[in-house]
């Protein structure tokens, strides 16, 4: 079977898979290189309809061509042998597995032939070509993985746990509260009540301690809670995930091009899990470098971090000035004159600090409301409304473009 597969994969013809990450991973493991273009119907499906809930071969087969996989014979054989039909499939006799595999391949090809018609109808061939070019890169990234310093991760975990306990002890000492749960609002409410400090509440009246609220609070106890939470999240979410998923000193994270059953985005933005390497801490000047130092470049190589400078503001300014929205031309002129700082230019226009201008500007671009803005700035909703009104008065082009885009989308 392996030699037959090797001959098939050596040809330059298209190779059609459903969930190619799994199949190509095993083929690569067995030393079977793949020539020709790789086509993945599980990636094509969300191009055609990103609002589907299920993207398995069986679900898509029934949805589009009214044909699913018959697993009765495989399940009966597995039961007879006392095995799980999926997890232990490799232990079953080939007579049973072969029938299932043949059916699997045939359904994938039928689905692809149907998808070609839909790609044509929806004029999606250009985006299809793009995604299929990205696919081998994503597969190679997963297979290559990234080196991690496991020993350093383990020692850092211990260090951060000790640090968290020390901060929590200090919170207990300062407040007189004997039991403190960092992520339980009711527990933190007792700390604030003991110190006669006010705090936010949800619309239903429950205590609320958001990240922005704690960051903007002037009392030292709020900063202790914020720091303890950050330390806790760092070791319990990031470091634990690294230690759980590392294999022989490397991380091979799941990378999703589009939406699927296990995650992904409808916009086509890459997403990751096991672990999510896109959410490695960066903003904290102490913890950020600490966690990032756990990821090692290949021997003899070094890391390079590259990013577009103010990508969203530049695009916003381009379209706002082209549309002649109020105030956009001044920002466009600043860009043309040199390497302008969008948020500082807007801050100068409005008469607010750069951090506030950035929070509001990006917030409007992504549809943030008054409540979220108040939370981000650490002020009341009424105060946020006044700041937002001032922003829209002196930099109206941001809201004008956002509203225009929403009208087009609707």
Model-derived segments and their meaning:
Residues 355-366:
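Short, amphipathic alpha-helical "recognition" segments used to contact nucleic acids or chromatin
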Residues 47-50, 99, 306, 334-337:
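Conserved, non-catalytic sequence blocks in retroelement Pol enzymes and Pol-derived host proteins
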Residues 1, 312-349:
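Metal-dependent catalytic core segments for phosphate chemistry
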Residues 35, 52-55, 62-65, 70-287, ...:
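Conserved "right-hand" nucleotidyltransferase catalytic core of DNA-directed polymerases
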Residues 291:
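Cytosolic ligand/metal-binding cores
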